[in-house]
Amino acid sequence: MQFGIVAAIADGGRTARAGGSVRPPRRPPASHTAWGLPRGRPTGQPHATPTKSGPTSIAYVEVNNDQLANVGRYQLANGANAFDVAIIFAANINWNGSKAVLYNNENVQATLDDAATQIRPLQAKGIKVSLSILGNHQGAGIANFPTQAAAEDFAAQVSATVSKYGLDGVDLDDEYSDYGTNGTPQPNQQSIGWLISALRADVPGKLISFYDIGPASSALSSSSSTIGSKLDYAWNPYYGTYSAPSIPGLDKSRLSAAAVDVQNTPQSTAVSLAQRTKADGYGVFMTYNLPDGDVSPYVSSMTKVLYGQAATYH
């Protein structure tokens, strides 16, 4: 992603990262389901879907450009879902002059409003749906809440949205905040921990994932394992690369060292990242930018390695 809501209105929320690197997503906690998913059941009434053995697959979707529902069209040979978690990219953290406020651009809002066709069908298949949140060039972000109360206020806004639209979780991304803009404070070491703790209290049983980048990443890397253990997943944020996050309280079963941009990472690189994920025993495999339409040859190149099965598009 490489823009906040200002850019998000035109761009949808997440593009290539600054400095030429293309950015990826985040991470997990407690008991896991048959798909390797953490605690809590998907919202809705999923059908009895065939299971698979292997890493939990993440699919970020730029809803400014593509349909979230497309995630559910990929199936393995035995009928299992190719992807386990679909992430709406992305809502924003705006600044209203006195505090951080959650903002959805028109495309994110349309996806939420059209839950009957964009979200519920995925959940009925056992695919969890999360909302990603990142900065919007207004000075507010997940790393600079000045007090615990401020973090709790924002967490309550997020929790209300998760509840209202029947979502399965939230994804945190420390990009495009432009800390200091509009007189906002600089990042601090406590902010991200306050937010994660407040979210875990507000949305028990829901997913909380972390796109491992920015000042929040630095703070988490030196934080108590008590904070990290409240996350469900974390992942490498640089597409086409392989590097696991280092967050106390999160073991490799809840991490993705791989980061794949489906529209930009060469297929051979995606295959190599899948092979390394399996060989090293990481429990999560993160992808970003799944487009509309059928890209099953690309998806299959990864699922054959991760699950020993090709993926088809239905």
Curated annotation (Swiss-Prot):
<keyword id="KW-0326">Glycosidase</keyword>
<dbReference type="GO" id="GO:0033925">
    <property type="term" value="F:mannosyl-glycoprotein endo-beta-N-acetylglucosaminidase activity"/>
</dbReference>
<dbReference type="InterPro" id="IPR016289">
    <property type="entry name" value="Endo-Fsp"/>
</dbReference>
<feature type="domain" description="GH18">
    <location>
        <begin position="55"/>
        <end position="309"/>
    </location>
</feature>
<comment type="similarity">
    <text>Belongs to the glycosyl hydrolase 18 family.</text>
</comment>
<feature type="region of interest" description="Disordered">
    <location>
        <begin position="14"/>
        <end position="54"/>
    </location>
</feature>
<comment type="subunit">
    <text>Monomer.</text>
</comment>
<dbReference type="GO" id="GO:0005975">
    <property type="term" value="P:carbohydrate metabolic process"/>
</dbReference>
<dbReference type="InterPro" id="IPR054861">
    <property type="entry name" value="Endoglyc_H"/>
</dbReference>
<keyword id="KW-0378">Hydrolase</keyword>
<dbReference type="GO" id="GO:0005576">
    <property type="term" value="C:extracellular region"/>
</dbReference>
<feature type="signal peptide">
    <location>
        <begin position="1"/>
        <end position="47"/>
    </location>
</feature>
<feature type="active site" description="Proton donor">
    <location>
        <position position="175"/>
    </location>
</feature>
<dbReference type="InterPro" id="IPR001579">
    <property type="entry name" value="Glyco_hydro_18_chit_AS"/>
</dbReference>
<keyword id="KW-0732">Signal</keyword>
<protein>
    <recommendedName>
        <fullName>Endo-beta-N-acetylglucosaminidase</fullName>
        <ecNumber>3.2.1.96</ecNumber>
    </recommendedName>
</protein>
<dbReference type="InterPro" id="IPR001223">
    <property type="entry name" value="Glyco_hydro18_cat"/>
</dbReference>
<feature type="site" description="Important for substrate specificity">
    <location>
        <position position="174"/>
    </location>
</feature>
<keyword id="KW-0964">Secreted</keyword>
<dbReference type="InterPro" id="IPR017853">
    <property type="entry name" value="Glycoside_hydrolase_SF"/>
</dbReference>
<dbReference type="Pfam" id="PF00704">
    <property type="entry name" value="Glyco_hydro_18"/>
</dbReference>
<comment type="function">
    <text>Cleaves asparagine-linked oligomannose and hybrid, but not complex, oligosaccharides from glycoproteins.</text>
</comment>
